[in-house]
A protein has these predicted regions:
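A short beta-strand-loop structural module common to alpha/beta enzyme folds
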Residues: 30-39
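Active-site-adjacent beta->alpha loops and helix N-cap segments on the catalytic face
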Residues: 39-48
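Conserved beta-strand positions in the central sheet of alpha/beta enzyme cores
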Residues: 33, 58-60, 103, 137, ...
């Protein structure tokens, strides 16, 4: 039986984060995850998690100046102080709510200086997270949805994980992003399995529910199970209506 995590950055966005956690529990999800929870008091989130018994798998570092086109800070040369403050904030919030992982967002950048900044900031994040037993995640984003994002392929992510050399740095493997950029989702899952810390999914190419599109998720989920993966898979898709009306796939794909 496949277990699923509701990504509350996309699901039940018409509700407060605590109420979205409750909705995910009522719908039969096994875990939750979120994007940027910082506007919600951590105590309210923790209370909803304790009430429902759902684990919070992860959250993202802040993106920076979103209106100005920023999409993360950790690979921006000269912005190390801001990047590390964002990492500290994320780890502090994760500690307060009991979240397992923090996704460190690289940002829109390119070149060797950006690579060096990202490696240094990831080492900082991993050192800080290790003390609390947390995992740091990095995620390649496809170039159609996130043009200019520093990290856009799984190969680049694998190289970064090797360079940083921290045992608690892992790949967030989003089948949607990999499907858009690289294809061969199952082949990449098999090749990268030792590096993966979390798996997400959505239909390719429209990022809708996983019951349609170019990727056959029944096959993908069976392959993931065959790879001895037992953590909940992150449903990070964009509902084409009220979230509760888009959950038929949970029955057919579980």
């Amino acid at each position: 039986v496949t277990r699923f995590s509701a990504n509350l950055g996309f699901l039940w966005t018409d509700r407060s984060l605590p109420d979205a956690i409750r909705a995910a529990a009522a719908a039969g999800f096994d875990a939750v995850e979120c994007h940027w929870p910082y506007d919600t008091p951590a105590a309210e989130v923790r209370a909803a998690l304790e009430e429902t018994g759902l684990p919070m798998l992860g959250l993202n570092t802040r993106r920076g100046d979103v209106a100005g086109g920023e999409n993360g800070l950790a690979a921006l040369p000269g912005r190390e102080a801001e990047a590390r403050a964002a990492i500290d904030d994320a780890l502090e919030y994760a500690e307060a709510i009991g979240a397992l992982c923090v996704h460190v967002m690289a940002g829109v950048a390119e070149g060797a200086d950006a690579g060096r900044a990202f490696v240094a900031n990831l080492r900082y994040a991993c050192d800080r997270a290790a003390a609390a037993g947390r995992t740091i995640l990095i995620e390649p984003l496809n170039r159609f949805d996130a043009p200019g994002y520093f990290l856009d392929t799984t190969e680049q992510a694998a190289d970064l994980i090797g360079t940083v050399g921290a045992p608690n740095l892992r790949l967030m493997f989003d089948c949607y992003h990999v499907g858009r950029t690289e294809g061969d989702v199952i082949g990449r899952l098999r090749a990268l399995r030792p590096l993966i810390g979390h798996i997400q999914f959505a239909a390719v190419p429209d990022r809708g529910p996983p019951d349609h599109g170019e990727v056959d998720y029944a096959t993908v989920f069976a392959e993931i199970a065959a790879l001895d993966w037992d953590m909940p898979l992150g449903a990070e898709y964009k509902p084409d209506g009220p979230t509760d009306a888009t959950l038929g796939w949970m029955t057919t794909l579980r």
